């Protein structure tokens, strides 16, 4: 009842859903070249059957609040660009609790590939990481096909009024319900909300089946409990 009541209270705060989350983005002429991203002892190569996928999106104002001083965050956080939700990545999940990763070695992404997707995932190094760790485990996918797929899934998402939600008491379940209202076919149990230790919104993880359709998230995937409080950072820092 508590989650239902919270969702009902939030319904009045959800106007027509917004789509584009790169409010302002200009790709620079000089794009930093990423370094190789390879398997390590702590992050080993793991080839496993794919049971589904996770589409992870990051709340950029919160990211910039915590990580804006990092050298690799300048494009996203420290210039005239402005973002809402950005695309973290498309992650193959395993059939159980483990997932495939770093399935094969790969070279540095071409500049044109990075430039084409920098306004969705505003970090050349993160793009390199996502392809190396996750994309290489998707059979038959090239970097261009992998990013085209992840950007298509990201691009179809619609969003509630995050500014309005940030000004009212909010739970993870309430945010999930608001996100579901903005996206026909998406239910609250098809996503997970993550936050930092202070309760500031970090990411939303959307659960997909092997056909890239929304599905109920497995219980082991983690995220906040539906009644956990969530705060939304509005400013960059």
Question: Model-found features: residue ranges?
Answer:
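Bacterial N-terminal signal peptides that target proteins for export
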Residues: 1-7
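N-terminal signal peptide c-region/cleavage motif recognized by signal peptidases
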Residues: 15-17
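N-terminal module-boundary/linker segments of secreted carbohydrate-active enzymes
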Residues: 21-64
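Domain-level detector of nuclease and nuclease-like folds
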Residues: 68-237
């Amino acid at each position: 009842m508590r989650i239902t009541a919270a969702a009902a209270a939030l319904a009045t705060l959800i106007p027509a859903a917004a789509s584009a989350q790169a409010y302002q983005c200009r790709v620079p002429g000089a794009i930093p070249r990423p370094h190789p991203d390879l398997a390590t002892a702590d992050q080993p190569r793991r080839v496993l059957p794919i049971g589904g996928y996770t589409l992870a999106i990051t709340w950029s104002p919160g990211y910039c609040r915590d990580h804006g001083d990092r050298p690799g965050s300048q494009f996203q956080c420290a210039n005239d660009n402005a973002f809402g939700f950005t695309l973290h990545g498309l992650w193959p999940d395993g059939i159980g609790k483990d997932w495939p990763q770093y399935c094969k070695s790969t070279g540095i992404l071409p500049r044109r590939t990075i430039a084409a997707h920098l306004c969705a995932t505003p970090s050349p190094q993160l793009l390199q990481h996502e392809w190396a760790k996750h994309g290489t485990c998707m059979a038959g996918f090239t970097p261009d096909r992998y990013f085209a797929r992840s950007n298509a899934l990201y691009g179809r998402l619609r969003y509630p009024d995050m500014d309005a939600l940030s000004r009212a008491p909010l739970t993870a379940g309430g945010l999930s319900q608001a996100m579901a209202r903005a996206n026909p076919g998406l239910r609250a149990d098809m996503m997970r909300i993550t936050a930092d230790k202070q309760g500031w919104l970090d990411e939303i993880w959307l659960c997909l089946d092997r056909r890239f359709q929304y599905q109920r998230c497995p219980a082991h995937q983690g995220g906040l409990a539906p009644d956990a409080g969530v705060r939304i950072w509005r400013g960059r820092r």
